[in-house]
Amino acid sequence: MYHQLILMALIGVIMANVVPFSMSNIPEEYKEFIPEEVKNFYKNLTQEDRQILRELASKHATFTNEDAALEALKNKSDKLYQKAVELRNFVKAKIDSLKPDAKTFVDEIIAKVRSLRPEDGQKLDMEKIKQAARDIIAKYEALNEETKEELKATFPNTTKIITNEKFKRIANSFLQKN
């Protein structure tokens, strides 16, 4: 179960760092698990910034990749673009510091999480999210101990999150098969 909690926290961290992503899409009971860097990014947004992010998030399917989304953001607001790039670089530096096995694992999680984004006007599909979490947990459990330790060291907020009793209850209930 400990490994599952690590993975759920890691998924949360990565989901929160996918740009553009709206904090309003995160249920209140999960917001406490979002890293401070991400909270600060969204907390310091103006109403205009929020509107720009909502507009771009609604068009996420039209962007071929993250760079295209950032370019669209730059065209709307250079200041917001700079903030987003700073947040992206923070996450990218952590990921780039990983050894190949850990980096591949994180890259796969990011791709999986991005694939879960709903189309315009659609809600998140909780069953797809649960299945994705199960798939990621299986991949995590197949990693060697050195890679698991590296992931824990690189994402220290995960340790704080997984020791939180509330998070453990949420993770257990979330992954229950219906």
From Swiss-Prot:
Keywords: Coiled coil, Glycoprotein, Lipid-binding, Retinol-binding, Secreted, Signal, Vitamin A
Localization, UniProt: Secreted
Any single GO CC term annotated in Swiss-Prot or TrEMBL for this entry: extracellular region
Keyword Repeat set for record: no
Coiled coil: 67-89, 123-154
Glycosylation site residues: N44, N75, N157
One Pfam entry name: Gp-FAR-1
GO terms of molecular function: fatty acid binding; retinal binding; retinol binding
UniProt modification remark: N-glycosylated.
Top-rank lineage group of the source organism: Eukaryota
UniProt cross-references to InterPro entries, sorted A to Z: Gp-FAR-1
Signal peptide (residue range): 1-16
Family: Belongs to the fatty-acid and retinol-binding protein (FARBP) family.
Biological role: Binds retinol and different fatty acids.
Protein name: Fatty-acid and retinol-binding protein 1
Organism name: Onchocerca gutturosa
Gene expressing this chain: far-1
